[in-house]
Amino acid sequence: MDSAPVVIKYGGHAMTVPELGRAFAEDMSGLVHEGGRFIVVHGGGPQISALLKRLSIESHFVDGLRVTDDATMEAVEMVLAGQVNKAVVGLFEGYGLSCCGISGRDGGLLKAVVE
């Protein structure tokens, strides 16, 4: 039986350094070609903050966590599901990896409840 895939987080700050992205993709390519299976989840904090600034939407944080009103959530989804997701897929494909990018919203994959 195959082992379960390993989940790896690729942070938004790491994405701002092109050399780190290339090294990460190269390492992932080597591991996949050796038979490894992975799910990569990505961040995007700096990218979100940059778009919010361009849109003149003020970021609010409580205990280090971003508070997301409707306008902020729309911007977050644009950045994560659009810009960042596509960039990560493109990076990996450039290193010969077959991959796809999905959002937790796609097909109701993930649902959250506010407590």
Ranges and model annotations:
Residues 1-115:
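Nucleotide/pyrophosphate-binding catalytic subdomain
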